[in-house]
Regions:
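Structured catalytic/translocation cores of nucleotide/phosphate-coupled proteins
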Residues: 45, 53-56, 74-78, 123-136, ...
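Sec/Tat signal peptide C-region and signal peptidase I cleavage site
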Residues: 17-21
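Bacterial N-terminal signal peptides that target proteins for export
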Residues: 1-7
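Bacterial N-terminal signal peptides
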Residues: 7-15
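Beta-strand-rich cores of mature extracytoplasmic or soluble domains
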Residues: 92-188
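Short, solvent-exposed loop/hinge segments that bridge or flank secondary-structure elements
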Residues: 24-25, 30-63, 111-125, 180, ...
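Contiguous, well-ordered beta-strand patches that form the walls/edges
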Residues: 36, 57-124
Length: 189
């Protein structure tokens, strides 16, 4: 009986957390050499923030040009044996996502961030207001194999950014970063 009650409470909390998720968008300026080289003017991250505070990234947007990478959950095992924990110089506790190469400009991001790779994973430090961000890029490496013959991903770059600010999003749904929202300032289209 107690298990059923606790299960119900957990389910209710999950429903409340999901219902309260808020879509937000933060912009960041590049500070590391890799970030400056790969992003130019920086990045803007569209993410969902739950009640527990940390954000789950949905899209990475180039701040200076209309290019976006849609993200999906990344799997540690796709990086090779041990995942992030087995790589040197990597934050093993970071959130891992894979760039969807078939959506938007995903292929462009794969080629730019990890030349020669066909897949791109991005790990994110905690996304929070007024907090700097670290993104590490990983690509599949056709020439690298683990001792047991499995494929192994490689670290392509460590991108450090300083927090710039938050975009005010229009109400009623997620924003379209490629849409000129200033068109609506002079009345309906």
């Amino acid at each position: 009986m107690k298990q059923a009650i606790w299960g119900g409470v957990a389910l209710a909390l999950l429903a409340v957390t999901t219902a309260r998720a808020e879509t937000r968008m933060f912009s960041y300026d590049p500070i590391s050499p890799d970030a400056k080289r790969l992003t130019g003017a920086g990045v803007t991250i569209l993410f969902n923030q739950g009640l527990l505070g940390s954000g789950r990234p949905v899209k990475v947007l180039a701040t200076g040009v209309p290019a976006e990478a849609r993200l999906r959950d990344g799997r540690q095992k796709d990086l090779g044996p041990g995942g992030l924990a087995a790589m040197d110089g990597v934050d093993a506790d970071a959130m891992l996502f894979e760039v969807d190469a078939k959506a938007a400009q995903g292929k462009v991001y794969v080629r730019a961030f990890c030349p020669g790779s066909t897949r791109l994973w991005l790990s994110f430090s905690t996304i929070a207001i007024r907090r700097d961000l670290r993104i590490q890029a990983f690509g599949d490496d056709p020439n690298a194999e683990a001792p047991n013959g499995e494929k192994k991903a490689r670290l392509c770059g460590t991108l450090d950014f300083s927090y710039r600010g938050e975009w005010r999003l229009p109400g009623g749904g997620p924003p379209d970063p490629n849409e000129d929202w200033t068109d609506t300032l002079n009345g309906p289209r």
